[in-house]
C-alpha cells in the first residue's frame, strides 16, 4: 500500500488478496460494490495466472485439468483454460479460472503433485498488467471503471 499512498486521498484497499509468493495484477478500489462484484464466487470473474512449476507439467495432467471435471478438497473447481506458456519450458503453465478460493491455483497443482515456485496473475476481470512494470501502478480509465461496474 506504500506504493500507492500518494495516488489518492480516498481510502483504497485491495480487491482480493495475494499470498506472500504471488505477484502480478492487483486492483485497488474505494468502491465496495466493485470489490464485491470482483470477489464474490457467484460472479464468475475470470483470472489468468502464469504458474512456474518445480518440474515439467505432464501432458496427461494438462488434459486432466482441461477435462472440466476437477475437484480440490472435495469442491469442484472451474478451470476455463490451461495450456503450456508459448515459448517457455513445459514447467511454465497458463491457467484461467473463475474460482475465488484462497490459494486455489497452488492447490490445483498440489492436488496433481506439483509445487508452484512462482505465481503471477496476468489478467483479472478483463484487466491486464501489460505495459505496467513490476512495482508500478496506474489509474484506471473511466471506460475501464465502467466495464468493471457492468460485470
Residue locations for each model-derived region?
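Basic, flexible Lys/Arg- and Gly-enriched helix-loop patches that mediate nucleic-acid binding at interfaces
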Residues: 1-151
